[in-house]
Amino acid sequence: MKKYKVIIICLIPAILYCNNCSEDRHKSNETIYPEKIYEYSDNISPRWSSFENINGEKGRGGMENNRAKGHAFDMIKSGERCLLLDTRGPGIINRIWITIGGRSPYTLRGLVINMYWNDEEKPAVSVPFGDFFGVGLGKTAVFENTLFANPEGRSFNSYIQMPFEKSAKIEIVNEMDYDLFLIFFDVDYQLLKHWDDNFMYFHAFWHRDTATTPGDDFNILPAVKGKGRFLGTNASVITKPEYKDYWWGEGEFKAYLDGDDEYPTLVGTGTEDYIGSAWGQGQFCNKYNGCLIADGKNRQWSFYRYHIIDPIYFHSVCKITMQQMGGTSKKNVIAMQKKGVNLIPVTISGDEAGLIHIYYKDSVVDLESPELPGDDAWTNFFRSDDVSAVAYFYLDKPKNDLPEIQNINIRTCNLKRDSAQ
């Protein structure tokens, strides 16, 4: 009997502990939404912010024009800011929908979307409008993936969940020298009774280099400190004409995590490989990866990968880079070298020798050496192109120490401009 009593005494606390854990897990899940769509949650109060009811204040929607359609849209004058949301927490933003009257490349890069959490002065998100919503180059595309959608090429949808404990503020800034005459929007969010300390804050960083340096990796995400999760990237490339139509996507994705120095923990095998394709990169749209712009005639590509089912967490620091590397036959590379094209040979493929390493940091190999494979041997080389990217990530804090967004001249360089909208 004593033996059974001991077992019962030991088990009761364990059972209570497990029950509490189960309740805590359920409460955490319920904070976002119930596990089943037919379950009720007392922790969630839905809100929609639009011009018809900024912040979605209770019982104050559609008050203009005697409850008819009174304020569905507005304008953003040159140099002004348009407030989409400015509310107190805790809460979670679940969806953002926006459409605008002008969608030229200059407009999509001239507008900036900023997001602030917990009354911080520096935005956690500061990205060109078009790039933020999943397509770069100042272009639009008809698509739907796990984070973004543009059903008919005329609207911009985000489904990224963005928790905030104390406050959330979202604005669109018109940095163009003309007015934007039409903007419609909805920011759909929910107020919460309970904040979960495991929630992280959403951040996004955009960067463009109009002429990358051969041998220097492009920074998708400069080193950011804190605990967090790299959510993915939407990247764009405009290739330089001096490389003709030779393949540009041999560069490898790299993730430097938690103390990595010269070498990363995560490394890919090629640009098109990183987004799930192979042997070149055409246009396609998948749930987690795709290439929405593949315009060989104009030498432009815009592509994405979102790490939803393969999360990249970090505990102290994270840096994400992409090499800018291409490839073609050895004879083509030699011809470019003789014309003074900016490149550095990296590898050459021999039939029997396999992949031959020919990259040296202090010198450039002589490709005409008789010791190397023949003229048709595939040769990879560092190159210089116009590259830009959005890095989407979560941090355990509402602000980051990343640089401010680049100015409108850099953002819109060589993009089509409209004189007015």
Language-model segments: what does each one mean?
Residues 1:
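S-adenosyl-L-methionine
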Residues 4-14:
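Sec-dependent N-terminal signal peptides
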Residues 25-421:
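Beta-strand-centric surfaces of beta-sandwich/beta-rich domains
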Residues 14-30:
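Bacterial Sec-dependent signal peptides at the C-terminal "C-region" and cleavage site
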